[in-house]
């Protein structure tokens, strides 16, 4: 209580940006401010990037939940463009850079035909019937994401590192952890290699049975644990892993026309597994790393 009184004594507003604020932390701050001061301290946010110098939207009003980035600031236009299952945020205004220095290739890719900057983030209206209530941040259109600490996770490199660390046991994987405290991996097993590790695996054993094999789980744990010893940073360290029995689906766009895993589509389709991976009390098949 004494620390809370000292913390809130002269506090009038809490501003956060660069990474999402978990809703449970938002609620705890509100509850603590009410218990200490008798009223709620205002929490607010804004949004933008280096290319928007850096402000593009802000919330100049009280918000009821985390994740609202506000409305466009004066002189700025933001349009929401359907991209897959999300709406991509694109920005235009006098604050937006005209391009990248001596990189016409990057400049051409960064803007659409109407001159809007492709920032790579997704969003949606907090209230579809009232745009004045602001835009709700909805993750990244691109694969890379931030942890709740604000640290960027570079998905492509981490995916390759995870597959190499547990080689040859993993066929492919998707990287999870947007707005989480740690990185998680959903991985497809290399069935043939996994059967070599499980001496008692019957030839006809199903993938769902195979991925519960104790010897397999132990082997994957050893490989990832060895990788973690050399990669202790939050953006590269793997905190938990779950093997998946169902292979990636072409019909569900989990595999691109080039044969690559579509990270965003896979995570969207396998959202229940992501929830299982990050559960407070995970199931036995979730491999946890200290």
Model-predicted regions and their roles:
Residues 1-4, 32-41, 126-131, 164-169, ...:
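Alpha-helix termini
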Residues 171-176, 181, 197, 221-290:
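Conserved C-terminal "lid"/linker of ANL adenylate-forming enzymes
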Residues 43-45, 51-54, 116-125, 135-141, ...:
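Extended, hydrophobic alpha-helical segments in both membrane/secreted and soluble proteins
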Residues 81, 87-147:
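Conserved ATP-binding/catalytic segment of the ANL
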Residues 96, 131-161, 194-214, 234-235, ...:
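Adenylate-forming
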